[in-house]
Design a protein with these regions (language model features):
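A Zn2+-metalloprotease active-site environment signal
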Residues: 1-209
Length: 210
């Protein structure tokens, strides 16, 4: 709703003004191409979900990433969209990643995690309208992006439904998981999934007939 959208924009502004995010180096044409491909796919899979896709760059281990913020903001980083030498994604795999993040948006996982990890701070922000103070609390925000296994299952299930709604199989997501697993463990895995639990279990769930 409105307060989540305002809060999400404050969080993005905080990340932009700090050391975490910088402007995307992808060409405007490439950004527009990805956004234009994702928009009708999202509309088919979740016509009731409002989102905003933004592109940013980052350095270090977090550079290969995509994540959702409150209010439907989905951030796609250059390291994932353009490759960083460790992982090269097809456009279908990028759409699967964005579908996964749209699942987090649909199920409001970030706000639910904020309530779980910092319920008092969230309650005070809602009561007093102090979203800026909460948005500036990096520890709280990073905790909210560490999803539970159940939340990841929900987002994976949505990603599969997203792909199928657009005439695709779960293969792009499965292929991505296999690529990441081949990077020889969490010390080399990109941030997009290095913090997501039970990668092998998630592959098996996607392969199971449902």
């Amino acid at each position: 709703d409105g307060f989540e959208q305002r809060f999400g924009q404050m969080v993005l502004d905080q990340m932009d003004s700090g050391d975490f995010l910088s402007p995307s180096t992808l060409s405007p044409e490439r950004q527009a191409q990805l956004a234009a491909r994702f928009a009708p796919m999202a509309a088919r899979a979740a016509p009731d979900v409002r989102y905003q896709l933004v592109f940013r760059n980052a350095d270090g281990p977090a550079a290969v990433n995509a994540f959702a913020l409150p209010g439907g903001i989905i951030v796609l980083l250059d390291g994932l969209a353009g490759g960083d030498g460790r992982l090269t994604l097809t456009d279908e795999q990028l759409m699967a990643v964005l579908g996964h993040e749209l699942g987090h948006v649909k199920h409001r996982h970030v706000m639910r995690r904020l309530v779980q990890t910092a319920g008092t701070a969230v309650g005070a922000a809602v009561l007093w309208g102090d979203f800026a103070g909460l948005a500036a609390n990096a520890t709280v925000l990073l905790g909210a992006l560490q999803y539970t296994r159940d939340f990841e299952r929900e987002a994976d299930d949505f990603a599969v439904a997203f792909l199928r709604a657009n005439g695709l199989t779960p293969s792009p997501l499965l292929d991505l998981f296999r690529q990441i697993e081949s990077l020889s463990g969490g010390d080399r895995a990109p941030a997009f999934l290095s913090t997501h639990p039970a990668l092998r279990e998630r592959q098996q769930r996607l392969q199971s007939p449902r």
